[in-house]
Amino acid sequence: MWSFYVFSVLYFIGGVRSAIDERLKDDFFHIYKNAAIETRDIQNRPVTEDQVTFYLYTNENPKEFTAIDSNNLERFRNFTNQIVFLIHGWTNSRKSEWLENMKNAFLVRDKNSFVIIVDWEDPANQLYYVSSINTYDVGKFIAKLLVNLYKNYGVDKRNFLIVGHSLGGQVAGFIGKQFKKQTLQSLPRIIALDPAGPLFTTRPLNERLNKDDADVVEVVHTNGGTFGFLDACGTIDFFVNGGSSQPGCKRIDLADLVGSVQEPLLCDHRRSWAYFTEALLNPTEMVAQKCNSWAEYKISYCDKVTVPMGDLNTTLTGSFYLKTNKEPPYSKKLSSGFSLSRLISY
């Protein structure tokens, strides 16, 4: 519970980015980064490679996993199908329900794919500001596996797909940076599901998820300004229901934080993976429309460019908006009303 209060205070500090200049942002970032590292050292809990583990699932037996490391990668040699890496967020582990559901969705979507659930439970279950710093090392260790598969086992980089939620979305950014640093090649696609915002909004670009971390950086925003990153930070950003709060989730004042409200407080944040799992299973639904803002989307003052959120091949760029239902199925038909932008152009 203490870590939850710390998280809330640090979020407030990190959220004043509009009131401080870039130099102050950098100063704040380095202060908290050094404090987090010192806390980690005092606790004698540095991130080690054995704290980042990998669990492979295939359609041969989708309920059973194979733990993999550098000693048993032969089955990946010259593998030509998609390899999906799923990465959890703060205080989670590989046993998180959303990972199981999304793993199954990917295996249904592509029966020949491999899905690897990444577990970084110990580094993720520390004070939030320490776990936020741990994302760099976790990303580095995951990237090491990808580079090994790419350089030594003939896996085409185009087969890699990285999906992360919350702090896992920020981990995904560090994977992309490290892969590019070690291979001089970009990963094809990163999908960040409501990537963590607190203590990342004030970071320089090289210290957080950004659009240069892969050829396509797809971001799904559902709780921006609270637990998620508020602003566009990918090559394509989906702002679901405006990107900050979700229908069907209870509105709670942060001043009322007590143990009993932690679950509903996280509802908006968790909708990102619920929406994306549904989009995977229904790839022609969850259609979003390109628009300059949520306000303009609501009055149909938008371009006619649309894309389903479950399109894993899109190279479209920009900000896209969509509405959902309060409960599953979340997909809502895109309005067929007239476009004010087209009307005004006549």
Per-range role (PLM):
Residues H88, F160-G169, L193:
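Conserved alpha/beta-hydrolase "nucleophile elbow" surrounding the catalytic nucleophile
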Residues W2-I117, P123-N134, K144-K157, Q182-Q185, ...:
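Flexible, membrane-associating and regulatory peripheral segments of lipid-active enzymes
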Residues P188-L199, H221-G225, G243:
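Active-site nucleophile loop of the alpha/beta-hydrolase fold
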